[in-house]
Amino acid sequence: MAVPSAHEFHWQSLARLSSGRVYHSLAEVGGQLYMLGGCDAAGRPTSSLELYSPEVDQWVSLPPMPTARAGAAVAVLGKQLLVVGGVGKNQHPLKVVEVYNTEEGKWRKRCSLREELMGVAITVKDGRAFAVGGMGADLLPRSILQQYDLRKDVWALLPPMPTPRYDTSICLQGSKIYVAGGRQCKRSVKAFEVFDMDSRTWSSLPSLPCKRSYSGVLWDSTGRLCWLGGLRLGGIHQSSKFTKNVNIFDPSQGSWMRSEDTVSMKTKRADFAAAIIRGRMVVAGGLGHQPSVLDTVEAFHPEKRKWESLAPMATPRCSASTIVIRDRLLVVGGVNQIPSSAHEILYVKEEEIL
């Protein structure tokens, strides 16, 4: 299937949130979009759970979470939403775990984590959730790898990561969990490691080419890791700089592609929305060297080997929560000086939206 051209991508504004929101979590169950928690305009974690109904283009309030939280890790286990960690009302990490049954419309508290954690990454394999890393109440990163069994309601410890970290990017490929980058005490790390579920062992991979934060991290259809843009933190005598670099790791080769074989983005940016839509890497919004939040959008054309500008976002913002449902990118909330209530979708014109 040919990739869509730049002019075929269109934005549409959808029903706004009831109030500005940031650091909320999104999940899809049966094609339905759920939004959980996040911080309000005053920076307070919320307990709200909302469902977006595309048929009538509106948000519907559902029973709130028992525990208010922001930045939670959410995993979909069948028809249930598993909510793990995050930051609570006291601005401290949480250990409480809760599950929402989308068919029953009810919340249940489940077996807690062994300790309070925020910045946990999570993935699902064969009906079990795997929680990776996190930051504890002492503000130190963790190397913990935990497996949750919903039927038994129990967390099991697996061999820890070689490199402790939080806010990492993970991807499940077959029976392997790839863990790329992350942070330690607010500093970014270059560590890139993989956990083999069959042998229950960790292996180190070639490190990320440079330390940078707030990058876009994508895994394409061939299993390659694409590391886009971000903020390179300066040292004692250097200021931090936004970058437009693109780095690609090919698991089949076990190495990072040479910089001359990749194509940089048009605009330097960090903290932006990123997704792969119909075979094209897309980046939208974020922060750059400009004085205001970005509204620019660009997409990489793999055959032309260049980035092309798309129509801009209607609402410029950074720190938005995103999810791809049926090859449509939904960008929900975020920040433009204050938390935003904007909710927009990027889709290819030849298709019907949602």
Task: State each model region's role.
Residues 1-354:
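Kelch-like beta-propeller repeat domains
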